[in-house]
């Protein structure tokens, strides 16, 4: 399938506009803290959420709002998570009402999200006072400001869009996301808001999203913490004019492929922007007996704090990788395992058939100092493969999280 990446982010698909402003939730006036994505018509909608038992109030409200598979807008604040508050659900519902009243739509058509400090009450006055400005500023170039408004400890905005064909019709998917810490998903430990002008039923949209999430966001880990507010929401306007997707046909597969491409872009950028991170680390496991084994092994390596620390130090300590494979719970023959490191600096094999082999430390260092490093693991037992995404573990990670509330 031919696919091209374009500008415009979450406002690139037909029917969508976006905006982001500073309303006053955050003390720093230079930081935007309120984002809005809006569609001119009713959308088919789907979402997946954190599996943390401590669940943010916005998720409770959003689940109810899109239980009919419909939505028209997404509103999100940063700075306060609205989690573990006695009046959290009431506040999230009121946030929907404030937004809906300003847009002239039903509050049940709002996806609401919050990100920030857990356990602190959210003051809705700044949101009330800023909503008119937020709505009046909605525009086709607003994805950038919306992406900035949902950031917390992120250092770069995360925004992508792509264009592809469905039944001869030009279709687009756009997305923004945030997340650099508390990323170890059982779904997608961050926020991602995705829009499309494809015509696809809510049922098929949810199916496609679940299919994509398991190979993208679920294979991402920055620090082993699963957050409380994580949401991936998708709105489909249907304005591109394709024949509505209601089954797993060729158009469904093409749409899912495009959605996967966008989500992979987001995941890699989130991994690279992990709190304090200096590099993206991708573990690709091949030669597994089945898909589950490949995923378990790749995720175990990426989640290892010792592997992360070795990547920070550009240390080719392959023993830590075998250790992570060994405790992963996967049924593998460690005596068959080969390990290589690869990057723009070159490629080097450091382990063969589960044992160390002579290698150049100088070349290994050259490979591992690059800002994108691949850990290549071959189990040599089958034909299945999987990739997991993460980053190195640095001094700055501790500093950022030690100072988070200040």
Question: Over which residues does each language-model region extend?
Answer:
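A structural signal for small-residue-enriched, beta-sheet-centric alpha/beta enzyme cores
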Residues: 1-90, 94, 100-406
């Amino acid at each position: 399938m031919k696919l091209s990446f374009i500008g415009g982010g979450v406002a690139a698909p037909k029917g969508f506009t976006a905006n982001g402003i500073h309303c006053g939730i955050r003390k720093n006036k230079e930081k935007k803290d309120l984002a809005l994505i809006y569609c001119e018509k009713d959308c088919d909608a789907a979402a997946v959420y954190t599996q943390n038992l401590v669940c943010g109030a916005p998720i409770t409200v959003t689940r109810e709002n899109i239980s009919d598979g419909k939505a028209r807008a997404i509103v999100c604040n940063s700075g306060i998570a609205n989690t573990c508050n006695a009046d959290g659900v009431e506040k999230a519902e009121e946030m929907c009402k404030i937004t809906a009243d300003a847009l002239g739509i039903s509050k049940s058509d709002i996806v609401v999200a919050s990100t920030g400090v857990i356990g602190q009450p959210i003051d809705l006055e700044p949101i009330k006072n800023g909503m008119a400005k937020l709505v009046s500023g909605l525009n086709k170039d607003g994805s950038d400001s919306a992406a900035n408004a949902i950031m917390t400890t992120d250092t770069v905005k995360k925004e992508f869009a792509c264009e592809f064909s469905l039944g001869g019709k030009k279709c687009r998917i756009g997305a923004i996301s945030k997340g650099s810490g508390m990323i170890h998903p059982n779904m997608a430990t961050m926020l991602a808001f995705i829009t499309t002008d494809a015509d696809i039923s809510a049922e098929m949209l949810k199916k496609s999203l679940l299919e994509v999430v398991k190979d993208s966001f679920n294979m991402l880990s920055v620090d082993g913490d699963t957050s409380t507010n994580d949401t991936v929401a998708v709105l489909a306007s249907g304005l591109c004019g394709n024949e509505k997707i209601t089954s797993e046909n060729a158009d469904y597969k093409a749409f899912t492929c495009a959605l996967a491409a966008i989500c992979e872009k987001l995941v890699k950028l989130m991994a690279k922007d992990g709190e304090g991170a200096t590099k993206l680390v991708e573990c690709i496991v091949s030669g597994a007996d089945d898909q589950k084994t490949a995923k378990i092994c790749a995720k175990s390596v990426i989640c290892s704090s010792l592997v992360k620390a070795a990547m920070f130090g550009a240390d080719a300590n392959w023993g830590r990788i075998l250790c992570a494979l060994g405790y992963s719970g996967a049924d593998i023959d460690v005596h068959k395992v080969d390990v290589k490191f690869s990057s723009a600096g070159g490629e080097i094999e450091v382990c063969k058939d589960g044992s160390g082999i002579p290698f150049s430390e100088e070349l290994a260092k050259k490979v591992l100092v690059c800002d994108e490093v691949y850990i290549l693991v071959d189990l040599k037992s089958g034909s299945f493969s999987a990739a997991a995404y993460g980053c190195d573990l640095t001094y700055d990670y501790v500093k950022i999280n030690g100072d988070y509330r200040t």
